Design a protein with these regions (language model features):
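Long, internal low-complexity/basic segments
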Residues: 21-67, 74, 79, 107, ...
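Active-site segment of extracytoplasmic enzymes that catalyze sulfate/phosphate-ester chemistry
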Residues: 27-29, 38, 45, 78-166, ...
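Core domains of carbohydrate- and sulfate-ester-processing enzymes
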Residues: 28, 33-42, 109, 119-122, ...
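A short beta-strand-to-alpha-helix junction
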Residues: 65, 88-95, 112-116, 141-152, ...
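Short, solvent-exposed turn/loop segments enriched in Gly/Ser/Thr/Pro and often Arg
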Residues: 76, 85-89, 107-128, 167-178, ...
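Active-site His/acidic residue clusters
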Residues: 79, 204, 254, 269, ...
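Histidine-centered active-site microenvironments of extracellular/periplasmic hydrolases
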Residues: 93, 177-185, 300-303, 307, ...
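C-terminal cap/loop subdomain of S1 sulfatases and analogous C-terminal strand-loop tails that border
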Residues: 188-198, 352-375, 392-396, 400, ...
Length: 554
C-alpha cells in the first residue's frame, strides 16, 4: 500500500460563504458537495447513522463478513443499448441476461461517466476527475505515461482494509510500470497493455474488411515513405502478474503477428479467468473486490460465421455474445452461494464510438445525441445496474444523479475502508450508500462537471445543463438546456440562461477555486514496458526508438 497521509482537514469553505465541513469527515470534497451539505448536513448525518446500523445487521447476518464487490465495466455502449427489453426490439440486439440482471436490482437512470475509456476508468479507480490525475485522454500506442503511483486506487483502499483484489480485462491506464494494476493495489491482474484499436483494428483482417486504411501494406503502400517507423509496431499485447512481481506477456511469441483470432482468444480467456477468479476468491474467508472489464463489444471485423442478432453489425454481434458471457458470470455467483453477500455493478464506460459508422457496427446513438469523446449526454450518460439481493430493492430505479467517481467512495463505505481514502487531495466521489439502500430521492449529488480532456465543456445541475461559453461570452448568453424537455441538447432556450447563467458561473468559480487550492497531480512518466520480464525483441526495439527522442529526465 502506498503511503496515505491521514491529516485532519476542515475545509475552509467560508472562503465561498458556505461554512465548515462536518467534523467527522476528513475527506476533502469539491466545493459543490460542501455547498449541498451546508443545506442537508443534519439530515444526511442522521441517515448515515441508520445506514451504519443496517450495514452492521447485514454483516452480522453474513457471519461478520463484509460484502464482496464485483464491478463489470462494458466498453462504448449507448444508453439503452443493454438492459432494456423494449429497446432490444428497436436495435435488433437481444440482451436477456443483462435485462434480467437489471430487473433484479436498481437501475441508475442518471449515471454519468467521463467521455472516453481511459478517463472513466481513472475516475473510478481514484474517485477523482481525471483532469486532476493527468489521465484525461485516450492514448493508443507507446506514450511512456500512466496512472501515477501517488494516486490511491479503490483497490488499494479496499486491500488496506483486508479485501482480496483482482482485475481481469481492459486496463488502459498507461504503459509504465507504476501504472500496472498489480502495482495499483490488485493482488492479481490479467490485462492488455493497450486497447482495442491495437487488438482488433490494427490487423490484416481489419484491412481486408476495409475497416483500416493506411496501416497494412495490402490497403496502401507508399513508395515515397522515408520514415520506416512511423506506424506503431512491436506493441505488447496481453500480460499477467501478481502484486509485488513482474508481468509476463502471454499472447505472442517473438516474430509472431497479431491477428483477429488472437483477439477472439483473448476475450474468451478473460471470460474464463473471471470465472476462475470468482471461484478462487469465493473460497477464502476474506471479502473480495473483482473487476471485470471486457474488451467486447468493440470488434472491427465481421468475424462471426452466423449472426446471433437480428442487427448483424459486428459491434452488435459481440454485444449479444457478451450478454451470454455476463449470464455465465451471474450464474457462477449463484452457484458459489455468495449472491446474498455480493454487490454486483454492471455499467458502460461511455457512449458508443459514434464516429465509427453505425452501418458497420450496428450500434447507434438511440436517445441521446453524441458519443465517445463528447461532453453531450450521448457521450457521458450510460446504463448502470446494481444488484444486492435482500439489500437493494429489486425492480427499482432512481433518477438521482450519480457520477462514476461516486463508486469509489461508496465501495469504500460498504467495505468499512473509508479511513484509507487519502485526505490530502480533492475526492470528487460522493458516498451514495444511502441511494443504494434507501432508494430513489436519497442521492447526494445534483450536479456534474464534464470535461473533454483538460477543458471544462459542460456543467449539469438538476435537469439543466450549460455548455460552457467560449471566453468573453457572458453566462447569460451560454447555451442552457432542460434535459427532460430536450434530451438531445438541440434547442437551447433563451429563457434558461437569463436566470441560470450566473448560478452556473458561480458553480464553475467554486470548482476552480478548489483546483487553485489543490492543484492537479502530475501524470506518471517513465520508460514504457518496464516490469515486463519477457519483452519480445520487436518490443524492445519499439521502446528504444521511442526513448531515443525523449527528454533526458525520463
Amino acid at each position: 500500500m502506498k503511503h496515505i497521509r491521514t491529516v485532519h482537514f476542515v475545509i475552509a469553505l467560508c472562503l465561498f460563504g458556505i461554512g465548515l465541513a462536518h467534523a467527522e469527515n476528513d475527506i476533502i470534497n469539491d466545493a459543490e458537495y460542501e455547498y449541498l451539505r451546508s443545506q442537508h448536513g443534519p439530515k444526511w448525518d442522521a441517515e448515515d447513522k441508520e445506514i451504519d446500523r443496517t450495514l452492521g445487521d447485514i454483516r452480522e447476518k453474513n457471519g461478520g463478513k463484509r460484502p464482496n464487490i464485483l464491478y463489470i465495466l462494458i466498453d462504448d455502449v449507448s444508453f439503452g443499448q443493454m438492459g432494456n427489453r423494449t429497446l432490444n426490439y428497436v436495435t435488433g440486439i437481444k440482451t436477456p441476461r443483462i435485462n434480467k440482471f437489471a430487473e433484479e436490482g436498481l437501475s441508475l437512470m442518471r449515471m454519468y461517466t467521463e467521455p472516453s475509456c481511459t478517463p472513466t476508468r481513472a475516475a473510478l479507480l481514484t474517485g477523482r476527475h481525471p483532469v486532476r490525475t493527468g489521465l484525461k485522454e485516450v492514448k493508443v500506442a507507446l506514450v511512456g505515461e500512466g496512472l501515477p503511483a501517488s494516486e490511491v486506487t479503490i483497490a488499494e483502499v479496499l486491500s488496506a482494509s483486508g479485501y482480496r483484489t483482482s482485475h481481469v480485462g481492459k486496463w488502459h491506464q498507461g504503459d509504465i510500470e507504476q501504472s500496472y494494476p498489480h502495482n495499483q493495489g490488485f493482488d492479481y491482474a490479467a490485462f492488455p497493455l493497450h486497447q482495442q484499436v491495437q487488438l482488433s483494428l490494427m490487423t490484416d483482417e481489419a484491412a481486408d474488411s476495409f475497416r483500416l486504411i493506411g496501416y497494412a501494406k495490402k490497403t496502401q503502400s507508399n513508395a515515397f515513405a522515408v520514415d520506416k517507423k512511423f506506424k506503431p509496431s512491436g506493441l505488447v499485447t496481453g500480460v499477467e502478474a501478481k502484486k509485488g512481481g513482474s508481468a509476463r506477456e502471454i499472447d505472442l511469441k517473438p516474430g509472431e503477428k497479431w491477428t483477429q483470432d488472437h483477439y477472439i482468444r483473448m476475450n474468451e480467456r478473460y471470460q474464463r479467468q473471471t470465472l476462475e477468479q470468482l471461484r478462487e476468491l469465493a473460497k477464502g474467508d476474506k471479502p473480495f473486490f473483482l473487476q471485470y472489464w471486457p474488451l467486447w463489444p468493440l470488434n472491427f471485423v465481421n468475424d462471426q460465421e452466423e449472426n446471433l442478432s437480428h442487427n448483424g453489425g459486428h459491434f452488435a454481434e459481440k454485444l449479444q455474445r457478451l450478454d451470454g458471457m455476463m449470464g455465465e458470470v451471474f450464474d457462477e455467483v449463484d452457484k458459489l452461494g455468495i449472491v446474498d453477500n455480493t454487490l454486483v455493478v454492471l455499467m458502460a464506460d461511455n457512449g458508443l464510438m459514434h464516429f465509427y459508422p453505425s452501418s458497420a457496427s450496428g450500434l447507434n446513438q438511440l436517445i441521446y445525441r453524441g458519443g465517445k469523446t463528447d461532453h453531450l449526454e450521448g457521450g457521458v450518460r450510460v446504463d448502470a445496474f446494481v444488484r444486492w439481493p435482500g439489500v437493494i430493492e429489486a425492480g427499482s430505479a432512481a433518477g438521482d444523479i450519480v457520477h462514476v467517481t461516486d463508486l469509489y467512495t461508496t465501495f469504500a463505505r460498504l467495505g468499512q475502508a473509508t479511513e484509507y481514502i487519502p485526505t490530502d487531495r480533492v475526492i470528487d466521489g460522493i458516498d451514495q450508500t444511502a441511494l443504494l439502500l434507501k432508494g430513489e430521492h436519497h442521492g447526494r449529488r445534483d450536479y456534474v462537471y464534464i470535461y473533454e480532456n483538460e477543458i471544462l465543456r459542460s456543467v449539469v445541475k438538476q435537469e439543466f445543463k450549460m455548455h460552457v461559453p467560449r471566453p468573453g461570452l457572458p453566462g447569460a448568453g451560454a447555451p442552457v438546456f432542460n434535459l427532460y424537455r430536450d434530451p438531445r441538447e438541440e434547442e437551447p432556450f433563451v429563457g434558461l440562461p437569463l436566470w441560470s447563467g450566473a448560478s452556473f458561473q458561480d458553480m464553475i468559480k467554486r470548482h476552480m477555486m478548489m483546483i487553485a487550492k489543490y492543484p492537479h497531480a502530475k501524470l506518471g512518466k517513465g520508460r514504457p514496458y518496464e516490469g515486463i520480464e519477457n519483452l519480445r525483441p520487436e518490443s524492445k526495439d519499439t521502446v528504444a526508438t521511442f526513448m531515443s527522442w525523449q527528454p533526458a529526465q525520463q
